[in-house]
Amino acid sequence: MESPTHPKPSKDKTFPWNLVFLVGILFQIDMGMANPSPHQVYNVTWVITNVQTNSRANATSMLGTLTDAYPTLYVDLCDLVGDTWEPIAPDPRSWARYSSSTHGCKTTDRKKQQQTYPFYVCPGHAPSMGPKGTYCGGAQDGFCAAWGCETTGEAWWKPTSSWDYITVKRGSNQDNSCKGKCNPLVLQFTQKGRQASWDRPKMWGLRLYRSGYDPIALFSVSRQVMTITPPQAMGPNLVLPDQKPPSRQSQTKSKVTTQRPQITSSTPRSVASATMGPKRIGTGDRLINLVQGTYLALNATDPNKTKDCWLCLVSRPPYYEGIAVLGNYSNQTNPPPSCLSTPQHKLTISEVSGQGLCIGTVPKTHQALCKKTQKGHKGTHYLAAPNGTYWACNTGLTPCISMAVLNWTSDFCVLIELWPRVTYHQPEYIYTHFDKAVRFRREPISLTVALMLGGLTVGGIAAGVGTGTKALLETAQFRQLQIAMHTDIQALEESISALEKSLTSLSEVVLQNRRGLDILFLQEGGLCAALKEECCFYADHTGLVRDNMAKLRERLKQRQQLFDSQQGWFEGWFNKSPWFTTLISSIMGPLLILLLILLLGPCILNRLVQFVKDRISVVQALILTQQYQQIQQYDSDRP
């Protein structure tokens, strides 16, 4: 490629490449965000079109994923041909090729005549793949310029191939009089066709096998993919107005529900109002509902744990965690309603614990999550998870999985319960944060509610529905928590969609504006040359945010140093780590005992040795007195 002439130095030409690189990054981000879940169900329509007349010969629609939505297509040969085989009298060449007595579908006799001729089909999406490098021609030859280019059809030599996308055969005819459609064709997709990309139409050529010139008909097969409920954007961006604090009504409701709920008719109405309320709630209300629903579920299962506790919603990822469970899923041939509500984007669950039901080929790294493993089912089946559960696959979170996708991608899924990441704390843990001298007696214990309520859907409440008032109560409280989680996930999906559209619109506007300005100032050498700018770039203001964060960290560091300077040397030890406090309290007793032994041990030992020696001397004296007798002494002076 030749470089365009430019009057400015070479450094002025660097910005367009930087812009292309920047926009390329934007498109990569957009493509990553727009990558849907492979289990997403769409309304897929297959259209067969006569290329020569641009008329639609057949259109078949079905619900399914992009992997298994390959139905059998039925089309009539006369609809596929149209008027292209009708005789053209003024042209002698055409008259010789298309005899008015044998071709076309205008009369009943001609329709019956088409049933007697074999036909063969040649692909136009790969015209060079003939036998031994034979060129198969173009559209004027029906892509069948040489024998061996045909890949399917209904002829005596039975044309086949291992790489073409479709097979075309004759169907059964029910109309012997040929007053209607009497030349049915059956089009089926091959395994290669199911693996191919159908982003654009693909063309084939169909020719009748007869003596002389074989008539040609060109047709194309295309796929149209539409979502079940197409999104409609109206008004401003919904992401920014959604960031609002909790409403007072939600706070008042939370105070009322802190007591033990009773079995009344108001409980179902509160659940129904939460699902059918037309008012759009904000981020603050959604977070409050998650904590409130968690409390109600925990209070319904174990009221003793909710007498004095703290429930904290974790503000850092992961926001949800999964508990693997065992359950009975529903196996259906048509997509159930739960499959139609599959998220548009892939949601990843980074933390899954426990053991449950696994479907597919599970690698060794994840076999610890499987208590029961099933290989799945062959064919087109949809496995819907039980109410309140999801399938956690390595391609994302989904309430319904397609076995065609699972078998084709070698994917695996685990049946899980989805819980918000809410930690359970004893009251002492919170009180220490309000104490000026923070001292932890031991390492604080924090449990997630998922570990405390795991298996509630399948093994606990769901199994006890209808057995009494407690089961009904716990089911209602758990359902309210599920509604809160569903609302939060739905809001997350809407936010991602809105951000995706904003990014796409921004990249399109940047490209259009820059391309238009460069074309407008083409004679001057481009926009930068016309503005006489040596450097054209986008001013990124994230540096200001980075500087402000650095200043904030510096102020926090100064406050920490001031706080440490006001403390004594002994108090500073216990504020460094709770592990240090636990270690000191554990070894202080043995250390004091050892110190006392070292100080008082020698004195006590000396006294003990002296006492033993004295007793030994006494014993020796007693032994000597027993073996000898005392000699009596007489005084000579005494009479």
Swiss-Prot record:
Residues 605-639 are cytoplasmic. Residues 473-522, 532-568 form a coiled coil. A lipid is attached at residue 603 (S-palmitoyl cysteine). It holds the Pfam family TLV_coat. GO terms for biological process: fusion of virus membrane with host plasma membrane; symbiont entry into host cell; virion attachment to host cell. A motif (CX6CC) lies at residues 528-536. Disulfide bonds join 122-144, 136-149, 309-312, 309-536, 528-535. Residues 445-465 are annotated as: Fusion peptide. A motif (CXXC) lies at residues 309-312. The chain crosses the membrane at residues 584-604. InterPro entries: FMuLV_rcpt-bd, TLV/ENV_coat_polyprotein. One of its GO terms (cellular component) is membrane. Glycans are attached at residues 43, 58, 299, 304, 328, 331, 387, 407. The mature envelope protein (Env) consists of a trimer of SU-TM heterodimers attached by a labile interchain disulfide bond. The surface protein (SU) attaches the virus to the host cell by binding to its receptor. This interaction triggers the refolding of the transmembrane protein (TM) and is thought to activate its fusogenic potential by unmasking its fusion peptide. Fusion occurs at the host cell plasma membrane. The transmembrane protein (TM) acts as a class I viral fusion protein. Under the current model, the protein has at least 3 conformational states: pre-fusion native state, pre-hairpin intermediate state, and post-fusion hairpin state. During viral and target cell membrane fusion, the coiled coil regions (heptad repeats) assume a trimer-of-hairpins structure, positioning the fusion peptide in close proximity to the C-terminal region of the ectodomain. The formation of this structure appears to drive apposition and subsequent fusion of viral and target cell membranes. This is Envelope glycoprotein. It comes from Feline leukemia virus (strain C/Sarma).
